[in-house]
């Protein structure tokens, strides 16, 4: 990969210059009062993006460190968990549950297809589960499941906690954490938040804190025990704060500087405007792809605002396609996963790349590679169709670029 390639993969994402510049600071000790206040402010901003009043816990590492910490903090040996699978990434939760001595029971749904709530309801009625998990935005299929709130209600009706993997949706798709009553909502820096790889976070409900504190068998995970980060009373209050959030481990200071700036950009744009921008650019990209005679893997009503999985025409190998895309057009992205590893590519349109310039450039490059591989289509069809989508949107409201 070259330094001037455009990252159109489903994470990591390109990073705005503002965010990169925010890290260019002298070394600082994370336990100073000054940094503690910065830490608190950053987590308050993150809670706004989560749309929650719950406490958000930052976990150093990738998104998987957040998933593992959340699960190991609540699951004890022998506990049952219902794991909803609608793509590759749901399986991670099952592995973690089993790894700490729990019993994961998977319920599988076809990639890119609707969930059958009746199946989930029947499964929950068959036994006692401590936890239900699912992925909000399945990066492997390009499907977003806004039915997560309905799944949360089913979980709570049967006495279970609800964990939502929002790794590739937070900051790019509407995620009403409190309205859906999500108990453990996991995300990370390097997807739609558009900050550097290295931090995950978990928004934790009071219900989940109570389960952690009521464990019969203590959490064996020292690093990932979320109770280390539980807010403690601050007496006397400082600057109006009555609680202090401890740092369970030393915070990655410069990653926090970057995260703070990325969150500042999100809140400056406004959540509603940001979600609309992602939806528009995702629509333009998908319509362009369809104009080439291709169909995204996810059905239209589940189409993700942050990532699209595109099965290639018969006989075209993903590895060859991606090589042409990068070497000849400077677009770096990733192949499909699971059964689509060799036959599909995935394009991320999130964060700073969810803009017309990146979408149109990527569509032009995909057209050129398909033509080189002998796929028949009307030249310019993808770019022209995407431009039509943007033009139609302009009549409603101008398309806004993202400041760098």
Placement of each model-derived feature along the sequence:
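Conserved beta-loop-alpha segment that forms the PLP phosphate-binding cup at the N-terminus of a helix
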Residues: 53-82, 86, 90-95
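Conserved active-site segment immediately N-terminal to the catalytic lysine
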Residues: 178-190
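Active-site phosphate-binding strand-loop segment of PLP-dependent enzymes
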Residues: 115-171, 184, 192
